[in-house]
Amino acid sequence: MKFSIGGSLKLAFRPWVEGLENIPAEGPAILASNHLSFSDSFFLPAVLDRKVTFIAKAEYFTSPGVKGKLTAAFFKGVGQLPVDRSGARGAGEAAIKSGIEVIERGELFGIYPEGTRSPDGRLYRGKPGGLARVALATGAPVIPVAMIDTEKIQPPGKVVPKLMRPGIRIGKPLDFSRYQGMDGDRFILRSVTDEVMYEIMKLSGQEYVDIYATAAKRQIAEAEKAAKDAAKAADKVADKASDKDGKGAE
């Protein structure tokens, strides 16, 4: 099913790819990508000859009804692996465990170091827990990947994607085997993550923001709420002024 889905995506969207030769023909590797759109996890597997496994929310595989079954079949078809994210710490450990298992099978494991989609198209600080821990626990090479323009195809909240060409740039493998077994050292984890994010930034050309994307989303939500509250307050003041003017005219 993966190949039929991948073939359909390539035919419809005609994604362009650079650096495909950096994906090994065999053996394990970690593909670390920026995350602009829900569709990122579909376009990258579509252009690869090998299966790549990404982590996905368990809800995508357990939703009821016909739509739920179709969604589950689609996610399985493109190589998604369900992980329960209901508990933050437990979810993180489950994702790391799943990633290590994929690598130990000699396969490709895909991960988004930012931990969530970018809220504004910029590249945010990578979280050191997932990517670096899997890399240092296994010694697998890390291949930086940049998704290009996927946020224009399917922005957050948009169900029907826009037909246009996305791009995918694949960088040269990064070797962190010198740190293998040091996945308990938080300074090493931070250093490895930052190096990977720097390579992704060079490939994508994105502006880098040294805060987590989750924090940026909170700031944006708070700013939007403050703007709405201010607008409501202004409307109330205007209504009161209008009422006074009306009474004065009487």
Feature annotation, model-predicted:
Residues 15-20, 40-41, 68, 96-98, ...:
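A generic local structural motif
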Residues 23-88:
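Catalytic core of membrane glycerolipid acyltransferases/transacylases, capturing the structured
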Residues 7, 21-22, 44-45, 72-73, ...:
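Short secondary-structure boundary/capping segments
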Residues 10-17, 90-93, 151-152:
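Short gly/ser/thr-rich secondary-structure transition/capping motifs
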Residues 93-250:
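Non-catalytic C-terminal accessory region of glycerolipid acyltransferases
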Residues 1-18, 50, 67-78:
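A transmembrane-helix-recognition feature enriched in membrane-embedded lipid enzymes
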